[in-house]
Structures are given as C-alpha cells and as structure tokens.
Amino acid sequence: MTDLSIVSVETTILDVPLVRPHKFATTSMTAQPLLLVAVTTAGGVTGYGEGVVPGGPWWGGESVETMQAIVERYIVPVLLGRGVDEITGIMPDIERVVANARFAKAAVDVALHDAWARSLGVPVHTLLGGAFRKSVDVTWALGAAPAEEIIEEALDLVESKRHFSFKLKMGALDPAVDTARVVQIAQALQGKAGVRIDVNARWDRLTALKYVPRLVEGGVELIEQPTPGEQLEVLAELNRLVPVPVMADESVQTPHDALEVARRGAADVIALKTTKCGGLQKSREVVAIAKAAGIACHGATSIEGPIGTAASIHFACAEPGIDFGTELFGPLLFSEELLQEPIRYADGQVFLPEGPGLGVELNMDAVKTWTRN
C-alpha cells in the first residue's frame, strides 16, 4: 500500500476574476480570493483543499490571509508525519491547537480526504459511505442589476435549461426599495422559476416583521437569514409568521448551533456549507442533528472555486440529508477555468465529478496565472 504519511503541506493564494460583480448585503466583489492547500504524502500523492469565504472577513471573521497564517503556523505541525487516513484523529488534535477558524480547517479536512481517496484509487464520496445519486439541483444567484435585466438573465437561464431556481441578495438597499425590486422579479418569473432571497442577517426584527410577509405575498418561496444569526428567537418568530420555509445560514456553523435551531423551531431549512462547518466530518454532524429534528438541509455555497465545490458535490451526493437542493454554482461565477475539465452543469443540476479523490484535476498553468504575487 502507498505510504500515507504526510511529508509536506503547501498553501497558495489565488485571486480569480468573476464574470460580473457579486453583491452581498455589506460588500461586493469582482474577484474571489481562494486559499489552495496541498497535502502531499510520502507515496507521492497530493490532495487539495480550498479555504474560501464569500468576499472577505465580513461573514465569519476569516480571510484567505488569516487562513494561510493559521494553516502554515499552527496546523502544519499537527499534520506532518501523520497519515492522511487519520482524519478522525487529526481534526480533534487541530481543534486543541486552533479555536474556531472553521474555514481554514475545512481546507485541511478536504485536502486530507482528497489525498486519502486518491491513494486508495476511489472517489471521496466512497469515504463518506458512497454516492446514492449522481447529481443535485442547483440554484443560481442573480446579480444586483436593474430588475428588467435580472428578469431577462433569469429567463435566458430557464430557456437554456441551466437553472430553474434563483436567489436574490437583499440588505444593501432601503428595505422598501429592495422589497419592491424582488417582488417585481418574483412575479415576472412566477410559474417559470422559483425565487428565494437572502438578507445576510442585515435586517432588525421590526424591519423583518414588516417586509418578510410582503416578500412572501409577492411570490418569494424561501426566506434566508433575514435577521442576525444569534437572534434565534426572532428567526423563530418569523418562521411561525410565514407559510414558506425560513432558512438559517449565519445561525448555524456548528453541530450545537443546529441543535439550538431545532430546539427553538427557528428554521425549516439549514444552509449547510462544508466550509463554515469546518469540513466534511463536521458537516455530517450538523446534517445528522437536522435529520433527527426533521429539518431539511440545503447545500449552500461560500462562492467556492472548483476544489471546494467538488468537495461539496461529493458530500451532497453521499448525504441523503441534503434534501433541499443546492446552490453549488461557484465555478460558474468565475470568468477563468481552473480545472483541466470543468464541472458539469445542465438541466438545473450539477453533476458529481468522476475519478479518484475529488474527481477533478487542476490546470496548473491557470493556477499559476491567478496566484497572488
């Protein structure tokens, strides 16, 4: 058997341009920074993971720069000499050295899974119990352009059968203006595609109580994290108020968070990101709690590149608890392809990459081009 002991860990920061600016409630970005983590074994196998947050530290306090420092200074010493098949022992040891920093830990967790699976000649989903499906539904995030342009973009995507469900970001504009814009789009797409919204936790209780019902009346099919993540009692109040699903994102980053959401009845759906949870292992714990509580899970995104997206696809295809679709569209937002063969999107689905490990191969020329100097 190939020697699985870790002999080197390398990190690289990339800045990959996007096809258009991507707007959140508090920021926008024209390029997505990625931290590439490469774990190499004595047997000559390299596995890759990706540290990524949506546009910087505004979301969870981490950035590619902090992730790189944490991985290189504190996590690498835990890894060297260990086997890539020791994930269940390695990750708790990392927890003892580094608190929080879940996005950095996710990059390492995925790199270990990729290296181990490649060493065995099997896909990552095999290590997770095996894939029970080969594709999952994928929602597309629409931009911040005027409503007429957004409607045209969405209808074009429906016509081409690439997407049948769309998300709109809110929270950056005046709530009345924001709501009117979203309702205009939702009504234009009614009967053709679903529309959901994400406020990125930027509304207070009174604003949410005023505008969330208007959004639902206007045809919005799902409300994601309208209020601050820690205010579970407000999220629960909104969940009782409206007849459409309420989804928790910022409110759930750990298994304990999922337990609290379940106890309070704060959400019908959890936005499960393998990044914010700290990797594939911790993500399984979150999904297990959600399943036990009867809460659905949605395969959400931090705008990952192809490595992070491939990892989340493997997870979603191996985990029946991801039962509310996904938004694993990250690579489609990038203007530059980082893989030798792109991840496949068609018919409103994203397809499981085939082959050992994550089933994708980096184009190292493209990686070099977009490496930060």
From Swiss-Prot:
PROSITE patterns: MR_MLE_1 (PS00908), MR_MLE_2 (PS00909). Its cofactor is Mn(2+). The keyword Transferase does not apply. One of its GO terms (molecular function) is chloromuconate cycloisomerase activity. Mn(2+) binds at D198, E224, D249. Its EC number is 5.5.1.1. It comes from the Bacteria. Gene3D superfamilies: Enolase-like C-terminal domain, Enolase-like, N-terminal domain. The keyword Isomerase applies. It catalyses: (S)-muconolactone = cis,cis-muconate + H(+). Keywords: Aromatic hydrocarbons catabolism, Isomerase, Manganese, Metal-binding. The active site is at K169, E327. One of its GO terms (biological process) is amino acid catabolic process. Belongs to the mandelate racemase/muconate lactonizing enzyme family. This is Muconate cycloisomerase 1.
